[in-house]
């Protein structure tokens, strides 16, 4: 029983705190003010103030669903809030359901058709058919080829090693002799077989189509799979294995998928960290070469992390502790030139700008999916400052050196300038569509990016040089702009006819652009078909003069069990007075969730979940 004077102290403490945010007294453990008032206690005597997470949408979604479910239990709510699948749960939300959340006032038949196309897009992007072709009809012994063929492929491998400047610049003499004489079974390190057959496939794939070429590619494919059938390639770090993973991921595009490419590059990054980059026991030359490779991998790592919404392999603090190669260093490492390649100065400036933008890409990733979600505007300003400077430098270098080049070299420089703009616009679109405050600014950059595709698509298919992005960047980056514009068209067909016309013209460029990339990968051809039909359905909605009528209840779209469509192709709609303001708030809330990573029991929801110790020596 509490003494009278003790009760008076409790009452005084609670009265003193009336109107304050914290409802409990720090003086006494006997305060029951929160309980008596029926409010949640926000004070913890362990020293932690418990506040509701600002962007924790999971609990809100669970609460909303609980209102419509009579058999929801506390355990069910707990499982849903933590991302664990409930027993007997059936995740059958379709793309049409998601579109209806965004555009509830639209019931046009084309909306249902577009929803089915989004399901088809998801299946295409996440498909593994390309990689499954690589493992088809495996063999137990290597096919052998004539000596002229093998020497041609070896010469190309030497040229690529010299051009890429990874870790090893030439083929070891004993490996060269074994491969030239068609004795692959005698090569001890399978990494060289993976590099050799990857380059051989790349060389043969660029030749004209004929029966002999098809048979040769089939044998090379099976040889590559047999060479890759060595677990040491993935678990035992070595310079040759890192190099093999990079060449496999970037040169055998025909048999790659976005996820497989990400896995290979991530493994290469992990192995490089395991070997050490700036370890004190390494000599200067080795540290310099590994630092160069770090910056090369950092570009690929951050690009794939943004494409697939995965955590980067390299922590962003590493870029501040590993010295960026200087322009003089980049110029010195450029190998001997032929007349078809641009001088070293332009390429050095371009690579330097790519190293700089890889740091900004890390900031973009953290602004979208990490801990810096409140710094979107700040990251956007840094991105714009980088682009202003990069454009001046690249244009000046091109102005000086382009007149000295052949037509092929000049075309390569033009591609570099276009790719720089392409990289910048893709990041601007990602930042603006992910921020509620900046979402209205996404339409202009989206239109500009899609209009850029006409010229860019003519230069990409036949070019494999220092100014080219990963194929997956060329396929993926325009999709965010595409989703922003067709969503704008579907939501506001009559709000601004002139703007709708510009958006329609812009989205029409994407199918044509993807068609030009169809020769490089079957995924491009499939995406071209899907986006062309989305454009047609959007055009039907724009051209429709009658008010849309409610659709009757129909069967669910095909493939209802597929994962939710990739966020990039879903519509992004900027708030506008022409829309019902009572509907825009749920729209913004829904779109905000598109840029939050799914709950993962290993990584959690952010990348910076561990403390970075600053030790790169591994």
UniProtKB/Swiss-Prot annotation:
InterPro entries associated with the record: AtrR-like (IPR050987)
Record feature DNA-binding region, as residue ranges: 14-41
Predominant location category: nucleus
Subcellular location(s) per record: Nucleus
Signal sequence annotation: none
UniProtKB keywords: DNA-binding, Metal-binding, Nucleus, Transcription, Transcription regulation
One CC-aspect GO term: nucleus
GO molecular function: DNA binding; DNA-binding transcription factor activity; metal ion binding
Region of interest called Disordered, as start-end residue ranges on this chain: 52-87
Top-level taxonomic group: Eukaryota
Polar residues compositional bias, start-end: 59-81
Role this protein plays: Transcriptional regulator; part of the ergochrome gene cluster responsible for the typical purple-black color of the ergot sclerotia. The ergochrome gene cluster produces several ergot pigments including the yellow ergochrome secalonic acid and its derivatives, as well as the red anthraquinones endocrocin and clavorubin.
PANTHER family: TRANSCRIPTION FACTOR PDR1, ZN(II)2CYS6 TRANSCRIPTION FACTOR (EUROFUNG)
Protein name per its UniProtKB record: Transcriptional regulator CPUR_05421
Organism of derivation: Claviceps purpurea (strain 20.1) (Ergot fungus)
Lineage: Eukaryota, Fungi, Dikarya, Ascomycota, Pezizomycotina
């Amino acid at each position: 029983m509490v003494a009278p004077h003790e009760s008076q102290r409790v009452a005084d403490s609670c009265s003193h705190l009336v109107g304050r945010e914290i409802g409990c007294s720090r003086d006494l453990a006997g305060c029951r003010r929160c309980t008596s008032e029926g409010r949640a206690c926000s004070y913890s005597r362990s020293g932690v103030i418990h506040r509701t997470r600002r962007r924790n949408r999971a609990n809100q979604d669970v609460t909303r669903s609980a209102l419509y479910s009579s058999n929801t239990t506390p355990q069910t709510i707990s499982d849903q809030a933590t991302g664990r699948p409930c027993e007997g749960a059936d995740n059958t939300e379709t793309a049409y359901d998601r579109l209806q959340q965004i555009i509830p006032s639209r019931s046009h038949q084309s909306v249902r058709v577009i929803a089915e196309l989004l399901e088809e897009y998801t299946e295409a992007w996440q498909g593994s058919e390309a990689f499954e072709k690589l493992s088809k009809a495996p063999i137990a012994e290597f096919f052998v080829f004539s000596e002229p063929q093998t020497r041609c492929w070896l010469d190309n491998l030497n040229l690529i090693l010299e051009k890429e400047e990874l870790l090893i610049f030439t083929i070891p003499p004993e490996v060269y002799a074994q491969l030239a004489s068609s004795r692959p079974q005698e090569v001890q390190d399978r990494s060289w077989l993976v590099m050799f057959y990857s380059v051989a496939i790349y060389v043969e794939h660029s030749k004209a189509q004929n029966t002999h070429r098809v048979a040769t590619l089939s044998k090379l494919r099976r040889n590559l799979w047999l060479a890759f059938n060595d677990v040491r390639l993935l678990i035992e770090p070595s310079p040759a294995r890192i190099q093999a993973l990079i060449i496999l991921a970037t040169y055998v595009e025909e048999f790659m998928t976005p996820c497989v490419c990400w896995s290979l590059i991530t493994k290469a990054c992990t192995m490089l960290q395991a070997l050490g980059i700036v370890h004190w026991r390494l000599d200067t030359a080795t540290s310099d070469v590994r630092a160069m490779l770090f910056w090369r991998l950092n570009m690929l790592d951050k690009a794939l992390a943004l494409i697939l919404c995965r955590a980067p392999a390299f922590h962003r603090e590493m870029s501040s502790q590993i010295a960026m190669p200087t322009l003089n260093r980049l110029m010195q490492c450029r190998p001997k030139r032929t007349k078809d390649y641009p001088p070293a100065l332009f390429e050095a400036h371009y690579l330097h700008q790519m190293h700089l933008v890889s740091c900004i890409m890390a900031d973009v990733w953290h602004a979208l999916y990490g801990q810096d979600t409140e710094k979107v505007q700040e990251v956007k300003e840094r991105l714009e400052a980088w682009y202003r400077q990069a454009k001046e430098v690249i244009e000046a270098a091109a102005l000086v050196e382009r007149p000295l080049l052949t037509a092929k070299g000049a075309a390569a420089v033009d591609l570099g300038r276009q790719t720089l703009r392409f990289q910048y616009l893709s990041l601007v679109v990602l930042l603006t569509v992910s921020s509620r405050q900046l979402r209205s600014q996404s339409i202009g950059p989206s239109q500009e990016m899609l209009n850029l595709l006409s010229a860019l698509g003519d230069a990409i298919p036949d070019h494999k040089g220092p100014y080219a992005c990963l194929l997956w960047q060329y396929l993926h980056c325009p999709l965010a702009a595409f989703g922003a514009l067709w969503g704008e068209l579907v939501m506001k067909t009559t709000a601004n006819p002139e703007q709708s016309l510009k958006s329609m013209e812009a989205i029409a460029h994407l199918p044509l652009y993807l068609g030009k990339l169809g020769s490089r990968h079957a995924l491009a051809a499939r995406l071209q078909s899907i986006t062309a039909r989305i454009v047609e359905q959007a055009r039907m909605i724009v051209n429709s003069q009658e008010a849309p009528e409610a659709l009757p209840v129909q069967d669910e779209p095909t493939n209802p069990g597929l994962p939710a469509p990739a966020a990039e192709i879903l519509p992004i709609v900027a708030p506008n007075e022409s829309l019902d303001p009572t509907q825009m708030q749920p729209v913004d809330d829904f779109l905000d969730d598109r840029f939050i990573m799914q709950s993962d029991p290993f990584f959690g929801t952010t990348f910076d979940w561990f403390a970075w110790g600053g030790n790169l020596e591994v």
